[in-house]
């Protein structure tokens, strides 16, 4: 005989209209001072409407909030992103999106631990390298890719020319940030970013993009807070 099936019921606390909805996953992570960048940095308003939020604005808001919450405790910033480009290197966003995140990371007081999981391409690799020195890391099978900005410009010749000048200016800024974060010579960085340069985590350590390769959270300089 089949046993009767009974539904598992949660306790009821007051009127349904006053119930507190369960927190979403990003909010739970933020409570533990964890930020996750898991998509490209789009600049298109149409894409932002489809996604439902502005990735760059969200990351910056989280960084600023965590400093306000506690300016002494570290922030853990996980990165799995192609930055402002697709896997092919074709532009889908402006480099200024990544510059804004890098500037905010340097502006705030808490140490920022950057950890690559999966991949960090182009401007995402720049963000990865912008963590607090000694606290930049990657999981063992991630990929770090260097490449330079592309125009992706369309329209009239004058518009393309204006965009091309902006791309060159952004490239110089990007090389300056990489040089500051890695200690590499800007001329070498210019050569290495001329084409896509794929690196293993060990190679990224040697290059100065990160400081260590992690096998587990125990390898972090400071332990991650546990979920309660």
Curated annotation (Swiss-Prot):
GO terms for biological process: protein quality control for misfolded or incompletely synthesized proteins. Transmembrane segments: none annotated. It holds the Pfam family CLP_protease. One of its GO terms (cellular component) is cytoplasm. Coiled coil: none annotated. SUPFAM superfamilies: ClpP/crotonase (SSF52096). It comes from the Bacteria. One of its GO terms (molecular function) is ATPase binding. Belongs to the peptidase S14 family. Has lost the two conserved residues (Ser and His) proposed to be part of the active site. Therefore it could be inactive. HAMAP family: ClpP (MF_00444). PANTHER family: ATP-DEPENDENT CLP PROTEASE PROTEOLYTIC SUBUNIT (PTHR10381), ATP-DEPENDENT CLP PROTEASE PROTEOLYTIC SUBUNIT-LIKE-RELATED (PTHR10381:SF72). This is Putative ATP-dependent Clp protease proteolytic subunit-like. The lineage of its organism: Bacteria, Bacillati, Cyanobacteriota, Cyanophyceae, Synechococcales.
């Amino acid at each position: 005989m089949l046993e009767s099936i009974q539904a598992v019921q949660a306790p009821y606390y007051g009127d349904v209209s006053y119930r507190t909805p369960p927190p979403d996953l990003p909010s739970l992570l933020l409570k533990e001072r964890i930020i996750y960048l898991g998509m490209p940095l789009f600049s298109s308003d149409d894409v932002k409407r489809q996604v439902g939020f502005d990735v760059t604005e969200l990351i910056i808001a989280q960084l600023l909030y965590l400093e306000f919450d506690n300016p002494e405790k570290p922030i853990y910033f996980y990165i799995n992103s192609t930055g402002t480009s697709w896997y092919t290197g074709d532009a889908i966003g402006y480099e200024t999106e990544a510059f804004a995140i890098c500037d905010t990371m340097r502006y705030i007081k808490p140490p920022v631990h950057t950890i690559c999981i999966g991949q960090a391409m182009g401007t995402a690799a720049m963000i990865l390298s912008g963590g607090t020195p000694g606290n930049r890391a990657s999981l063992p099978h991630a990929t770090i890719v260097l490449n330079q900005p592309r125009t992706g410009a369309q329209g009239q010749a004058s518009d393309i020319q204006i965009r091309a000048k902006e791309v060159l200016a952004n490239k110089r800024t990007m090389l300056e940030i990489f040089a500051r974060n890695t200690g590499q010579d800007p001329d070498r960085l210019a050569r290495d970013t001329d084409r896509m340069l794929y690196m293993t985590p060990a190679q990224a350590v040697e290059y100065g993009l990160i400081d260590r390769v992690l096998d587990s959270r125990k390898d972090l300089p400071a332990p991650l807070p546990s979920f309660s």
